[in-house]
């Protein structure tokens, strides 16, 4: 691939954004500053008008260590990277590009500078540009990414410690002359090819010790002799896996790392001197150079002029890089053969992980053991003739990289065995339970769980023994086995809880059915104010006073029966006493919810008003013996009405609150339910409705929980009931008045005189006499049974219905004939009718009023 240097002239002739696809060259390889190009690029990227709202990051490190690759992955830039077919300088000079990663978590307007790598063979011993470019990056950037390999940590020249020392010295000389201002920067050490064998904290400690020694060794201006490196620099660290050997892991970690390039705040609780470093946003306000974006080009050019004119700086040549370079090449060569064997397994494992279907890979253990042995022997035969220290270090690095990947495969294999084993265990237990339920025979849940758990553990150990690589630090899988057994126990407990939940649900449905019937019967009995219908046949106290006592007793007995059922069945689950206590506690709470829902259903305003009216009519329309009353003018209708109404009105306050007649207080619901068991979890409580007087956080007292009808509803209910009762009373009065007849006395004499012949004819004729006798006996029996009233009402109803039907048929006849239609037309507007009014024939009562009005009263 072409190097960045090959594109150096693009910005000189093009002005569109595509001309800067690979960024803009700020300083070329000849140390010349490209001010016009930089200014134009910032304008095209819309950075110039952003004021202080921009950030600058630089990266430096040894050549061919993947700095450009790192920036491209972090910021989506297109810096040219080194070809895998050759090793030579890629980035020439200093290049800049704007962040192309559009993640919302990153700061806006991030500018990234790719600095030419140090220790390149192209420049050889001439390291002046390396020094000056590093100083320029430090002088202009908020964050300086130091790109080093893990194996370079602890080295002096390999880790560019000499260059950092020079940076510290010149930084004090050039930028700290203003004693009133402290310029701070962040040195972000990105440790490449991080294997994880050495903890990152240890690498941090080593690097910070090196930083402290470097700072102590530099000459400081007057007044700064006692200064500390932490006075001017902050430090952060991050380890990245090998891009070639762990590409997916590398991409994943770079994505995580990119999220840290956002605005942050200093944590006052962290002390860098104690090895405490931030892992939050890297852009702190004190890092910013406070140079407006539109003046950055001129500022950067001035800084470069100061640096390029300082001719006293130089860096020594690093002596051991050859051995390190060759060992790296050999390591990569042996890893190629290693990859040929291992990568297919890694691909299968990663693909299965992405699909969420972990797979146990056959033959993995043998392939792992063989590939590791071959890689170590091949490296030993080729690299052992080089520098012993480098060889030993690189061999350890090879083993670390190989073991890291093999350990990942091993753990992935165990993870697959873990997940598949858990899934199979759960399915096997569920299938066994369903089989027992279908057969209709009892099954021992605890025995099923123990048997399936033993099978699952045996299978897991078999997979682990076949995959493990002896002699490695991770060959002991006892911890994974313990975790597996622990999760099996957790799944067993969850399955047991689920089974107990299903048992509880069945018991709750049984309670709901029983309470629905029993409580429904008690409420239905309210419709009768006489003996019978659920009321006691004997006793002076009305049955309504004991209403809530009966409801509570039925409720308690039903729940006790349900608890016995639940406890007996739970014993086969091997459930602990704590789990049974939680189940019984939930059952009581759920049962109260069922009872309260049933009460609320029965106490709906319409239902309650209907029951009150039925209760009133039962007391008003029937006598104490249960015989319907036939109202006569001489009856004390007002007295009976008043007693029946007042008796029914006493039900409203009685039903408004759930109170026991024995104690004149609400039932002891809080004591009956009991306290929340200590073993209850949030999952046990999340589906439970709060109960007043039981749950403190509910904010309701027990008295409020037992209030069925509010005071406002009681008043409204009383008014509506009285209106309905008044309608019944008016109907009774009309019935009594309608039965009155006033026959004049002279009518009887006239009847006797005019009908004497007919009377004699009837008495002399046996047939007529017998018929008269039968009619007289029937009339007497009807009178004794108080049936004349119903017969008269039925006759009136039949006659009224006949009249209504006759009117209907007459109207239909008139509408179907020509003469009738003409007569109807005359009554319409424009005809000879009275002003076009239309009158509908209505059925009238005995007082000449519309019968519909009486029906409206009856409906109340």
From Swiss-Prot:
EC annotation from Swiss-Prot or TrEMBL: 3.6.5.-
GO cellular component: endoplasmic reticulum membrane
Region described as Disordered: spans on this chain: 818-860
Uppermost EC category: hydrolase
Residues in the Lumenal compartment per record: 764-766
A biological process term (GO) from this entry: endoplasmic reticulum membrane fusion
Parts of the chain that traverse the membrane: 743-763, 767-787
Coiled-coil residue spans: 443-501
Localization per record: Endoplasmic reticulum membrane
Keyword list, A-Z: Coiled coil, Endoplasmic reticulum, GTP-binding, Hydrolase, Membrane, Nucleotide-binding, Transmembrane, Transmembrane helix
Domain GB1/RHD3-type G, first and last residues per copy: 51-300
Protein residues bound to GTP: 61-68
InterPro entries: G_GB1_RHD3_dom, P-loop_NTPase, RHD3/Sey1, Sey1/RHD3-like_3HB
Lipid bilayer topology: Multi-pass membrane protein
GO molecular function annotation: GTP binding; GTPase activity
Cytoplasmic topological intervals: 1-742, 788-860
Family: Belongs to the TRAFAC class dynamin-like GTPase superfamily. GB1/RHD3 GTPase family. RHD3 subfamily.
Annotated function: Cooperates with the reticulon proteins and tubule-shaping DP1 family proteins to generate and maintain the structure of the tubular endoplasmic reticulum network. Has GTPase activity, which is required for its function in ER organization.
Name of the molecule in the record: Protein sey1
Name of the coding gene: sey1
């Amino acid at each position: 691939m072409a190097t960045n240097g090959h594109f150096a002239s693009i910005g000189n002739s093009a002005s569109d954004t595509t001309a800067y696809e690979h960024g803009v060259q700020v300083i070329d390889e000849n140390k010349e500053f490209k001010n016009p190009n930089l200014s134009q690029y910032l304008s095209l990227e819309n950075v110039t008008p952003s004021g202080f709202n921009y950030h600058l990051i630089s990266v430096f490190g040894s050549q061919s260590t993947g700095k450009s690759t790192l920036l491209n992955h972090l910021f989506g830039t297109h810096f040219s990277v080194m070809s895998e077919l050759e090793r030579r300088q890629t980035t020439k000079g200093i290049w800049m590009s704007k962040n192309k990663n559009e993640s919302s978590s990153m700061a806006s307007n991030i500018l990234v500078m790719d600095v030419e790598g140090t220790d390149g063979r192209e420049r050889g011993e001439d390291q002046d540009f390396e020094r000056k470019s590093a100083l320029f990056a430090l002088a202009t950037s908020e964050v300086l990414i130091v790109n080093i390999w893990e194996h370079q940590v602890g080295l002096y020249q390999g880790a560019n410690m000499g260059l950092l020392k020079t940076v510290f010295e010149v930084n004090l000389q050039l930028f700290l002359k203003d004693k009133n201002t402290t310029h701070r920067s962040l040195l972000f050490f990105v440790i490449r090819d991080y294997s994880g064998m050495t903890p990152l904290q240890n690498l941090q400690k080593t690097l910070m010790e090196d930083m402290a020694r470097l700072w102590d060794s530099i000459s400081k201006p007057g007044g700064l002799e006692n200064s500390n490196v932490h006075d001017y620099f902050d430090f952060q660290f991050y380890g990245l896996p090998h891009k070639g050997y762990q590409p997916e892991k590398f991409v994943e970690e770079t994505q995580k790392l990119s999220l840290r390039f956002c605005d942050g705040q200093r944590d006052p609780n962290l002390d860098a001197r104690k090895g405490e470093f931030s892992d939050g946003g890297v852009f702190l306000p004190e890092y910013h150079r406070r140079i407006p974006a539109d003046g950055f080009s001129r500022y950067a050019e001035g800084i470069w002029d100061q640096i390029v004119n300082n001719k006293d700086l130089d860096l020594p040549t690093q002596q051991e890089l050859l051995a390190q370079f060759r060992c790296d090449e050999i390591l990569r060569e042996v890893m190629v053969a290693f990859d040929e064997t291992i990568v297919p397994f890694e691909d299968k494992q990663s693909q299965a992980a992405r699909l969420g279907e972990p797979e146990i890979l056959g033959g993995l253990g043998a392939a792992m053991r063989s590939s590791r042995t071959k890689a170590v022997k091949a490296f030993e035969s080729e690299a052992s003739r080089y520098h012993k220290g480098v060889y030993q270090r690189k061999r350890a690095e090879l083993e670390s990289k190989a073991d890291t990947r093999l350990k990942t495969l091993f753990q992935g294999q165990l993870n697959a065995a873990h997940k598949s084993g858990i899934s199979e265990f759960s399915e096997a237990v569920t299938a066994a339970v369903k089989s027992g339920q279908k057969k209709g025979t009892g099954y021992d849940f605890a025995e099923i769980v123990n048997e399936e758990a033993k099978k699952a553990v045996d299978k897991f150990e078999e997979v682990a023994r076949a995959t493990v690589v002896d002699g490695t630090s991770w060959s002991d899988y006892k911890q994974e086995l313990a975790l597996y057994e622990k999760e099996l126990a957790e799944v067993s407990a969850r399955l047991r809880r689920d089974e107990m939940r299903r048992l509880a649900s069945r018991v709750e449905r049984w309670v709901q059915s029983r309470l629905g019937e029993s409580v429904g019967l008690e409420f239905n009995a309210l419709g009768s104010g006489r003996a019978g219908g659920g009321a006691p046949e004997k006793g002076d106290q009305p049955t309504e006073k004991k209403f809530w006592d009966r409801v509570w007793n039925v409720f308690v007995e039903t729940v006790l029966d349900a608890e016995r059922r639940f406890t007996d069945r739970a014993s086969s689950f091997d459930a602990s006493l704590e789990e049974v206590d939680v189940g019984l506690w939930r059952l009581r709470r759920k049962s109260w919810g069922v009872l309260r829902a049933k009460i609320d259903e029965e106490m709906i305003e319409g239902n309650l008003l209907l029951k009150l009216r039925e209760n009133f009519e039962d007391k008003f329309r029937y006598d104490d013996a249960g015989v319907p009353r036939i109202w006569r003018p001489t009856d004390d209708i007002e007295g009976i009405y008043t007693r029946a109404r007042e008796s029914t009105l006493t039900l409203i306050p009685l039903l408004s609150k759930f109170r026991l007649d024995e104690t004149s207080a609400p039932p002891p619901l809080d004591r009956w339910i009991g306290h929340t068991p200590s073993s209850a979890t949030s999952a046990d409580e999340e589906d439970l409705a709060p109960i007043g007087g039981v749950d403190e956080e509910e904010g309701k007292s027990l008295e409020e929980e037992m209030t069925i009808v509010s005071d406002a509803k009681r008043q409204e209910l009383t008014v509506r009931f009285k209106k309905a009762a008044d309608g019944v009373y008016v109907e009774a009065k009309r019935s009594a008045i309608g039965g009155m007849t006033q026959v004049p006395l002279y009518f009887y004499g006239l009847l006797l005189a005019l009908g004497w012949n007919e009377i004699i004819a009837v008495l002399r004729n046996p047939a007529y006499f017998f018929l008269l006798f039968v009619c007289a006996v029937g009339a007497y029996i009807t009178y004794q049974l108080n049936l004349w009233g119903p017969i008269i009402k039925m006759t009136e109803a039949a006659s009224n219905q006949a009249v209504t039907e006759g009117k209907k048929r007459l109207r239909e006849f008139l509408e179907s004939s020509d003469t009738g239609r003409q007569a109807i037309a005359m009554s319409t507007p424009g005809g000879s009718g009275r002003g076009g009014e239309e009158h509908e024939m209505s059925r009238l009562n005995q007082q000449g009023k519309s019968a519909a009005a009486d029906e409206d009263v009856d409906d109340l």
